[in-house]
């Protein structure tokens, strides 16, 4: 109750998006044409041009964002990865698997460092009212949340699953069914724990090391909450999986029967067309289930994240009021209508989605009450910093 009263006492500023679908559509058309003409070379500049348009038209508290990552930054990073890709291919073709493994491990190690430096550069190149964001973290902590923790959790999940398979009985048909149900429960809970824990720890780590000017963000997510909604999101997918699986299994049985009892080619063709129709229906049911699960998980975790994000020791807070159904039909429209129109409707629908998200995002407090001063920080220099600037061109939710 105290939090609600405090939020009612402070001014609330919703994010405002000033971009239009028509303008964004023209930008995308020009980008596609230039990318085709240049045989894909222009793609990094096209992507950054779109991102700069979105940032420049996003406003909060009367001020707009600015985004300074260039296509050249992304292009240099892409060249680095292309070089490594062909180097690994050459070692494989030259029958030097050991060298290929060493190069792959080296790329993996470099990728972790590059991701951290890329996030730092992206934050420094993003500003609001002339005040830059910044991202500073220890590489030890970054390695832990992005590499070692996921691996250890995956090993733990695999171990639990393996032990469970050995402990469950399989002496009769009924015991096999019970074992399969229990294994499914173990799998769902394990996936929920994995996804929820990683989201909670990674987002807390990233944003606790992010600053706006001289003011530091703080966020502490409830890991139990994240695990709960990760499990519920997976459970929401199960009915769709069951229906789609039943349709596919039924069609497999029908296909087997038709191969045994079919009398002529016409009957075979009719059964084949009917099978294809039902297979398409099963795929559509499955994809819709993915959309339901994804929208539920996205809205639950984003709302929780924003409600726990604060700036300058809580003087500035945030609130997100996205709804499940709002996210669901926008996601479906974005995929389905974009597919039907060959991608032509994508720019319009994306702006529609961004505008809706902006209207449901609120800043609680007044940025003008804070001393808006930039940190004395400059972008990192050197070879590793240069090739890292295009690796992470987006900080989550920034």
From Swiss-Prot:
Domain of life from the UniProt record:
Bacteria
The gene name reads: yjgN
Membrane topology type: Multi-pass membrane protein
Q: Where in the cell is it found?
A: Cell inner membrane
Q: Which lineage?
A: Bacteria, Pseudomonadati, Pseudomonadota, Gammaproteobacteria, Enterobacterales
Question: Which Gene Ontology CC terms are recorded?
Answer: plasma membrane
Q: Which residues lie on this side of the membrane: Cytoplasmic?
A: 1-24, 95, 164-175, 250-278, 355-398
Ranges per topology, Periplasmic: 46-73, 117-142, 197-228, 300-333
Provide the protein name: Inner membrane protein YjgN
Keyword terms of this UniProt record? Cell inner membrane, Cell membrane, Membrane, Transmembrane, Transmembrane helix
Q: Which InterPro entries match?
A: DUF898
Query: What's the chief localization of this chain?
Result: membrane
Ranges annotated as spanning the membrane? 25-45, 74-94, 96-116, 143-163, 176-196, 229-249, 279-299, 334-354
């Amino acid at each position: 109750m105290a939090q609600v009263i405090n939020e009612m006492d402070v001014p609330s500023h919703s994010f405002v998006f000033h971009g239009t679908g028509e303008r964004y559509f023209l930008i995308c058309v020009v980008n596609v044409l230039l990318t085709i003409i240049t045989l894909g070379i222009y793609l990094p500049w096209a992507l950054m041009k779109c991102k700069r348009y979105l940032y420049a038209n996003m406003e909060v508290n009367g001020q707009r964002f600015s985004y300074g990552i260039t296509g050249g930054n992304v292009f240099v990073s892409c060249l680095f990865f292309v070089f490594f890709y062909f180097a690994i291919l050459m070692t494989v073709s030259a029958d030097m698997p050991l060298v290929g493994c060493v190069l792959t491990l080296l790329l993996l190690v470099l990728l972790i460092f590059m991701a951290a430096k890329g996030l730092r550069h992206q934050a420094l190149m993003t500003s609001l009212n002339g005040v830059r964001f910044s991202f500073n973290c220890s590489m030890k902590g970054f390695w832990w949340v992005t590499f070692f923790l996921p691996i250890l959790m995956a090993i733990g999940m695999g171990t639990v699953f393996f032990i469970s398979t050995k402990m469950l009985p399989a002496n009769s048909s009924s015991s096999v069914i019970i074992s399969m149900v229990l294994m499914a429960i173990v799998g769902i809970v394990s996936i929920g724990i994995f996804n929820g824990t990683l989201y909670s720890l990674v987002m807390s780590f990233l944003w606790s090391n992010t600053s706006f000017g001289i003011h530091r963000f703080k966020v502490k997510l409830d890991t139990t909450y994240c695990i709960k909604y990760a499990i519920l999101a997976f459970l929401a997918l199960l009915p769709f999986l069951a229906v789609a699986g039943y349709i596919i299994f039924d069609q497999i049985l029908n296909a087997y029967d038709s191969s045994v009892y079919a009398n002529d080619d016409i009957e075979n063709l009719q059964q084949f067309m009917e099978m294809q129709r039902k297979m398409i229906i099963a795929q559509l049911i499955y994809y819709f289930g993915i959309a339901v699960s994804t929208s539920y998980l996205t809205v639950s975790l984003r709302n929780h994240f924003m409600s726990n994000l604060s700036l300058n020791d809580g003087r500035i807070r945030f609130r997100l009021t996205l709804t499940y159904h709002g996210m669901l039909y926008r996601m479906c429209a974005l995929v389905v209508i974009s597919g039907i129109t060959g991608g032509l409707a994508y720019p319009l629908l994306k702006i529609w989605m961004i505008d809706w998200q902006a209207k449901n995002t609120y800043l609680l407090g007044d940025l003008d009450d804070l001393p808006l001063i930039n940190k004395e920080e400059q972008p990192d220099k050197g070879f590793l910093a240069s090739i890292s600037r295009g690796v992470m061109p987006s900080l989550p939710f920034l």
